[in-house]
Amino acid sequence: MNRYKYILSIFLVKAGIKLIIIMMISSSLYSQENSHNLNFMFTNNGYGFGYESEKFLKENLSIGADLRFYDIRSDEYPVYDPFVNQYKIIGEKNITMLPLYLRLNYYPFQGKIANNFEPYLLFALGPMLSIDGDENIRSFSKRWSNAETQISPGGSIGIGINFNTSTSNTLAFGLGYDYLKVEEPIHDKKDYGGAFLYLKYKINRE
């Protein structure tokens, strides 16, 4: 990717982050409760983690930012080499995806069942930054400084369940589907989406 496209990609990501922050601040004027969560993601293409802020607009509806980091590992697998008596990785790739989503959580049964059990639906939409590092470059800094990047639209839908405790901490788990398609193929592949499982830990509630 040439320098112009790289600068444009960075600009779009920064603009997306600013837009999410502005929407979060404006929504906080009407929010009943704020929370900050850590997410741990397990996907069919790898794994990841993320940060999620949640602000309730109504008792059963929240809005917030959903920032994720995906380490793509779908085509990698270990192979035993008897000559050196060690395992080596075949098909190693250095692909990172950074979705920057605006997220809505809808709690259809809020106030209708036990308060410590909260099913919800999630909808997330926003830009995704894809970074393809050159695995043939051994230097970590050079590998990522020369990486190709591109911006694509992304999104998620899913279901989850919050398990509230007597403290402010909450554990949750859920299932969902990611839409992660890139315009230009990365290692001959465009679609890195699919099903995912996530675990969520609420680190702070205001």
Enumerate the language-model features and the residues they cover.
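Extracellular loop and loop/strand-boundary signature of outer-membrane beta-barrel proteins
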Residues: 35-39, 86-92, 141-147, 182-189
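Residue-level signature of outer-membrane beta-barrel architecture
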Residues: 53-55, 106-108, 161-165, 201-203
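Residues that define the transmembrane beta-barrel architecture of outer-membrane proteins
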Residues: 34, 45-49, 59, 94-100, ...
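Outer-membrane beta-barrel "beta-signal"
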Residues: 101, 105, 191-206
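Short glycine/proline- and aromatic-enriched beta-strand/turn motifs that initiate or cap beta-hairpins
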Residues: 29-70, 200-206
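Membrane-embedded beta-strand positions of outer-membrane beta-barrel proteins
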Residues: 36-40, 63-67, 102-104, 119-125, ...
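Gram-negative (and chloroplast) outer-membrane scaffold detector with strong preference
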Residues: 55-139
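Sequence/structural signature of outer-membrane beta-barrel proteins
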Residues: 35, 45-47, 72-74, 111, ...
